[in-house]
């Protein structure tokens, strides 16, 4: 079910869920801009604007209700997402002058795990005919009907004992969900290559008249630009197994060319400032550091980003 915490009834219901015995796991996916500390958020806000402040309220209500700690799975594409989220919560504990017992509860009874999701999910289905056909086929109305690629991997950083707590192994998803002690190699590969490719070419492609990712893969200039960026400017900066990187990059074109996924460029462009900083800037800076010159494609990508946000672009 979905709750709207910006409505009084929805906020109250959210707090009831926070204190429920059934609640064991919270998953967050609030984009690169989501895990941010906002000092303007107050304990009395219903709800506060930032996600970490909302989470602090939820955990505090759960603590005051005498319920056990939860497992927090952060999916945002930032470094150390679980740890950064915990840092924000601890800052709100200090700002709101909450008791030491709650701070101990958050840091010892709750488990903040970093994680990495690798699956292209372009958004809800908009075609009325397709929606009607799916509803007829399955026999029910789904107001949150979405579409995603078949490929999917979720890497969770944590102790092996998480496999006994989380339901994925029992659900037969051992080939798609991995619990590992260090997810940084998986994250760097995915963020720099797959996400970096998306953010690296979509703004320029949109300015050139394209609307969906698949169309770009059918354009020799666009696809050539993406491949040159990946193989000449991104992969050489990654201190990981080169065969693995080349194999992963090779699959990117096929995934972007999925005939069943209409991934809109404007959807990917959301929060491009934080995305370019997280996905492309590290490759840009490391290339300059190693080669002593500007990377041609990444520099053009940066120029397209500036042009995209220019007042001259409609």
Describe the predicted segments one by one.
Residues 1-314:
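Substrate/ligand-engaging "lid" and interaction regions
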């Amino acid at each position: 079910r979905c709750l709207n915490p910006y409505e009084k009834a929805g906020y109250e219901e959210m707090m009831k869920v926070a204190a429920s015995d059934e609640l064991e796991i919270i998953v967050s996916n609030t984009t690169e801009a989501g895990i941010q500390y906002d000092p303007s958020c107050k304990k009395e806000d219903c709800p506060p604007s930032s996600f970490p402040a909302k989470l602090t309220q939820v955990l505090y209500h759960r603590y005051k209700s005498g319920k056990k700690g939860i497992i927090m799975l952060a999916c945002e594409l930032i470094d150390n997402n679980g740890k950064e989220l915990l840092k924000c919560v601890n800052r709100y504990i200090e700002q709101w002058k909450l008791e030491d017992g709650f701070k101990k509860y958050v840091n010892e009874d709750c488990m903040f795990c970093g994680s990495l999701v690798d699956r292209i999910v372009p958004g809800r289905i908009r075609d009325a005919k397709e929606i009607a056909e799916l509803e007829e086929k399955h026999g029910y109305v789904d107001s949150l009907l979405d579409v995603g690629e078949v490929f999917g991997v979720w890497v969770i950083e944590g102790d092996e004992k998480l496999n006994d707590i989380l339901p994925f192994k029992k659900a037969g998803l051992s080939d798609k969900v991995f619990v590992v002690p260090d997810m940084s190699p998986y994250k760097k590969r995915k963020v720099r290559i797959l996400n970096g490719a998306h953010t690296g070419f979509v703004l320029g492609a949109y300015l050139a008249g394209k609307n969906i990712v698949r169309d770009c893969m059918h354009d020799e200039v666009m696809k050539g630009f993406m491949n040159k960026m990946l193989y000449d400017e991104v992969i050489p900066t990654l201190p990981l197994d080169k065969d693995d990187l080349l194999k992963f990059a090779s699959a990117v074109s096929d995934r972007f060319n999925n005939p069943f996924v209409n991934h809109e460029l404007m959807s990917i462009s959301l929060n491009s400032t934080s995305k370019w900083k997280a996905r492309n800037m590290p490759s840009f800076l490391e290339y300059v550091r190693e080669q002593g010159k500007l990377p041609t494609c990444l520099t053009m990508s940066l120029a397209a980003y500036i042009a995209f946000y220019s007042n001259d672009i409609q």
